[in-house]
């Protein structure tokens, strides 16, 4: 039975969702068609405006086209000549800069090449000298080895002492000869190094001479450029003197002033014509937009009611999903309980078997006692973990139950908010109808103080802070007295905000009816209206309506309406003052209670 009921409810829910989707599609199509028609109408209006402006301004443009074209041609020719001269000067400067940069780069590269050549020559010379020294050392080594060999042979042959002395002198002379040869070689190496240094210095002298010539050429080019600049400066000075003389000439001055006045007059006439045409078109567009806004407000109120009913279906789906999840968890837990019971039975059967055979195995009791102690410890740990697991499950169930309660409260508050917003839109639509009905045709020029767009609350995924703000907006629409607005502006917790919102919806809705109030003078009303505009930022349409109602107090309905507006504005003044005082007193913790209540926690886990 329960499954059949659930299936029927799901079928009904699917049908309702399909109908809602179809209605949304039709609504989107209607909105798109309406937008297309609005765009076409705007295009036609703009085309009419442009046509009228063009026809009315042709008589002024045709007279001045020839003069403008001639002036433009003269100015363009002057600009072309000036641009040509500037381009020529720029090209010359670029050529000079490129030549200078090229010369500098070439000089740098030449200096680098010369340095590399010098280093290469020095490396080659050092390599050559080292090779020569190595060869010389090899020859000396071979000679010395030969002499040692000969000496050893002669010593073995037992020479006389005289021959040995002569041989020793000969070896000394040969060593002196080798030292002298080494000194000669070192001097030759030094001479070669000095010759290489002299050649490098000669190359540097040549390079410095070339740089000197290039610098002289650059100095000459700089001097020529300076002479050209002096000539250009003289020409500009002559032109400046001519311009000053023309400015001091009374004839040219009078003509220029008359031309400026004529140009300004023509421009002002064109602006006047275009502003008249735009004023007429914008006046018609304003009337049409008011009618469209009235229709849109009524449609939005109906859509808000439909969306309020939609939230109930979403809550049903969520609750059904949670119910299925909990049923699955219960089945899983039952299966675990059965498995644990089976394991317990097996464990008891295993314990009973060794108790039967205990009489035969009295000698091997040590190991059995040890295993028994381990099993007891494991059983105690299992029982403790089971207790902790049950505690955690109870905590999880408690948290889920609390989350469900919070979700229920949240859905109830959202439902209440949607109802209040739909009623708010209906009341706004009624107020606009009354304004359009009783508004006089005479237009009064009102200085625009503040421009604010009216945001229509279509998307209703609001948090608790937005609920507080919407309750404040609802207080403005429902025309609450000052004492009750004090109670709504200074809440202590989020629950108080929600309760006050429900009370304001249920109790203070019939206060909108136009009832007679205390008679106030017109001057006091105008003063209060000005103060209210500065504080609250009332739109220009409401201000114009209040001024018109203050000027035309002959009919009783308009008088009652103006009195109602003045009293509402007094209430707004007091509410705004109280809000400022509360914000000054408790600035860092606005609308948040100090205790951690269940409503302040996250409702979804």
Swiss-Prot record:
GO terms for biological process: cell division; cell migration; establishment of mitotic spindle orientation; mitotic metaphase chromosome alignment; mitotic spindle assembly checkpoint signaling; protein localization to kinetochore. The keyword Signal does not apply. It is found in: Cytoplasm, Cytoskeleton, Microtubule organizing center, Centrosome; Chromosome, Centromere, Kinetochore; Nucleus; Cytoplasm, Cytoskeleton, Spindle pole. Residues 3-442 form a coiled coil. The modification N-acetylmethionine is found at residue 1. Residues 545-581 are annotated as: Disordered. The modification Phosphoserine is found at residues 513, 515, 555. Its main location: cytoplasm. InterPro entries: SPDLY_chordates, Spindly/BICDR_Dynein_Adapter. One of its GO terms (molecular function) is kinetochore binding. Monoubiquitinated with'Lys-48' linkage. Deubiquitinated by USP45. Keywords: Acetylation, Cell cycle, Cell division, Centromere, Chromosome, Coiled coil, Cytoplasm, Cytoskeleton, Kinetochore, Mitosis, Nucleus, Phosphoprotein, Ubl conjugation. One of its GO terms (cellular component) is outer kinetochore. Residues 564-581 have a biased composition (Basic and acidic residues). Required for the localization of dynein and dynactin to the mitotic kintochore. Dynein is believed to control the initial lateral interaction between the kinetochore and spindle microtubules and to facilitate the subsequent formation of end-on kinetochore-microtubule attachments mediated by the NDC80 complex. Also required for correct spindle orientation. Does not appear to be required for the removal of spindle assembly checkpoint (SAC) proteins from the kinetochore upon bipolar spindle attachment. Belongs to the Spindly family. Interacts with KNTC1 and ZW10. These interactions appear weak and may be transient or indirect. Interacts with dynein intermediate chain and dynactin (DCTN1). Interacts with the catalytically active form of USP45. This is Protein Spindly. It comes from Macaca fascicularis (Crab-eating macaque).
């Amino acid at each position: 039975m329960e499954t059949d009921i659930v299936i029927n409810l799901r079928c009904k829910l699917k049908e309702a969702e399909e109908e809602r989707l179809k209605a949304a599609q039709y609504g989107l199509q209607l909105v798109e068609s309406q937008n297309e028609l609005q765009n076409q109408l705007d295009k036609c209006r703009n085309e009419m405006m442009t046509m009228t402006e063009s026809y009315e301004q042709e008589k002024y443009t045709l007279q001045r086209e020839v003069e403008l074209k001639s002036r433009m041609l003269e100015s363009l020719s002057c600009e072309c000549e000036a641009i040509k001269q500037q381009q020529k000067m720029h090209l010359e400067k670029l050529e000079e800069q490129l030549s200078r940069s090229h010369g500098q780069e070439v000089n740098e590269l030449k200096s680098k090449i010369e340095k590399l050549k010098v280093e290469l020559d020095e490396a080659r010379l050092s390599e050559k000298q080292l090779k020569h020294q190595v060869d010389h050392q090899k020859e000396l080594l071979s000679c010395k080895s030969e002499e040692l060999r000969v000496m050893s042979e002669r010593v073995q042959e037992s020479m006389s002492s005289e021959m040995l002395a002569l041989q020793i002198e000969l070896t000394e002379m040969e060593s002196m000869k080798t030292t002298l040869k080494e000194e000669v070689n070192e001097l030759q190496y030094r001479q070669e190094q000095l010759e290489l240094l002299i050649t490098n210095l000669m190359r540097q002298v040549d390079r410095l001479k070339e740089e000197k010539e290039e610098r002289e050429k650059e100095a000459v080019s700089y001097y020529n450029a300076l002479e050209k600049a002096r000539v250009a400066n003289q020409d500009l000075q002559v032109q400046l003197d001519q311009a000053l003389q023309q400015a001091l000439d009374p004839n040219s001055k009078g003509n220029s002033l008359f031309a400026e006045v004529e140009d300004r007059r023509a421009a002002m006439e064109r602006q006047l014509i275009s502003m008249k045409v735009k004023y007429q078109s914008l006046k018609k567009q304003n009337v049409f937009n008011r009618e469209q806004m009235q229709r849109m407000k009524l449609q939005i109120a109906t859509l808000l009611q439909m969306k309020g009913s939609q939230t109930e279906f979403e809550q049903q789906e969520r609750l059904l999903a949670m119910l299925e999840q909990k049923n699955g968890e219960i089945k899983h837990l039952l299966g675990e309980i059965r498995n644990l019971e089976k394991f317990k039975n097996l464990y008891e059967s295993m314990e009973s078997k060794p108790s039967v055979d205990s009489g035969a195995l009295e000698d091997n009791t040590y190991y059995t006692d040890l295993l028994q102690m381990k099993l007891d410890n494991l059983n105690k740990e299992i029982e403790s973990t089971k207790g902790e697991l049950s505690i955690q499950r109870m905590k999880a169930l408690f948290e889920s139950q609390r989350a469900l309660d919070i979700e229920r409260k949240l859905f109830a508050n959202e439902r209440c908010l949607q109802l209040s917003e739909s009623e708010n839109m209906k009341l706004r639509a009624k107020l606009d109808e009354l304004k359009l009905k009783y508004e006089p045709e005479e237009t009064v020029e009102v200085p625009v103080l503040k421009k604010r767009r009216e945001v229509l609350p279509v998307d209703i995924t609001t948090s608790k802070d937005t609920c507080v703000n919407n309750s404040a907006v609802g207080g403005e629409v429902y025309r609450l007295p000052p004492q009750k607005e004090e109670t709504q502006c200074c809440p202590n917790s989020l629950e108080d905000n929600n309760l006050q919102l429900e009370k304001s919806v249920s109790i203070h809705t019939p206060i909108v009816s136009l009832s007679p109030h205390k008679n106030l003078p017109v001057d006091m009303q105008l003063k209060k209206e000005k103060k209210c505009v500065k504080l609250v930022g009332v739109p220009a349409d409401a201000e114009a309506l209040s001024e018109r109602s203050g000027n035309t107090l002959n009919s009783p309905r308009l008088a009652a309406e103006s009195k109602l507006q003045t009293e509402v504005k007094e209430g707004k003044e007091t509410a705004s003052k109280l809000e400022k005082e509360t914000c000054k007193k408790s600035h860092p913790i606005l609308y948040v209670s100090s205790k951690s209540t269940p409503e302040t926690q996250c409702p979804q886990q």
